[in-house]
Curated annotation (Swiss-Prot):
GO terms for biological process: 3'-UTR-mediated mRNA destabilization; cell differentiation; DNA damage response; endocardial cushion development; mRNA destabilization; mRNA processing; mRNA stabilization; negative regulation of cytoplasmic translation. It is found in: Nucleus; Cytoplasm. This is RNA-binding protein 24. SMART domains: RRM (SM00360). It comes from Rattus norvegicus. Multifunctional RNA-binding protein involved in the regulation of pre-mRNA splicing, mRNA stability and mRNA translation important for cell fate decision and differentiation. Plays a major role in pre-mRNA alternative splicing regulation. Mediates preferentially muscle-specific exon inclusion in numerous mRNAs important for striated cardiac and skeletal muscle cell differentiation. Binds to intronic splicing enhancer (ISE) composed of stretches of GU-rich motifs localized in flanking intron of exon that will be included by alternative splicing. Interacts with EIF4E; this interaction prevents EIF4E from binding to p53/TP53 mRNA and inhibits the assembly of translation initiation complex. The RRM domain is necessary for mRNA stability and mRNA translation regulation. Keywords: Cytoplasm, Differentiation, mRNA processing, mRNA splicing, Nucleus, RNA-binding, Translation regulation. GO terms for molecular function: mRNA 3'-UTR AU-rich region binding; mRNA 3'-UTR binding; mRNA CDS binding; pre-mRNA intronic binding; sequence-specific mRNA binding. GO terms for cellular component: cytoplasm; cytosol; nucleus. It comes from the Eukaryota. Its main location: nucleus.
Amino acid sequence: MHTTQKDTTYTKIFVGGLPYHTTDASLRKYFEVFGDIEEAVVITDRQTGKSRGYGFVTMADRAAAERACKDPNPIIDGRKANVNLAYLGAKPRIMQPGFAFGVQQLHPALIQRPFGIPAHYVYPQAFVQPGVVIPHVQPTAAAASTTPYIDYTGAAYAQYSAAAAAAAAAAAYDQYPYAASPAATGYVTTGGYSYAVQQPITAAAPGTAAAAAAAAAAAAAFGQYQPQQLQTDRMQ
């Protein structure tokens, strides 16, 4: 002979979010106002005997269970509980109006440029998508920031007389052992060539004996420069 078990699909209620001090008696007392109760139990830990924070209440009929689940914010023993039919599980938590999601705001400068590329950096074309505007860097500014030598151009040679400069250039040209060719012209520069000067030359007023002596010393120092050694190394 088999005993018939009552169907509790629509009468058994899951109660979650209970305080640890809630007992079977206090749980039953809360649900008595909705109708007759067949069972009210708080689930406890077997080893410690403390409440696990949830329980089950079985109402006598389906109508009483529906009334017990209507309240969206039930308060049991001073704490908001989660009440729903057991076969449905716990109710999803309802977000309060005005709940703000933690979305990080982006700076306008990062939105305007893909991947937040700053404007004062120069990136290779292979790493930049088409459409990214990269500021143009003047060649003179780039050369001034990268060259380790002192560029002795116009202003630096102003202290020498035109005659001394012409004589020095002629002396340097006479010492070059190779004939001029189109291939060799790429190695010869006449203006803006960088030299490492060890001792500064004292400027003197033009038309004086000191100016003539300074010009002669500059011509002699310039004439001792032998560019053929540098050219030989490059052509080997």
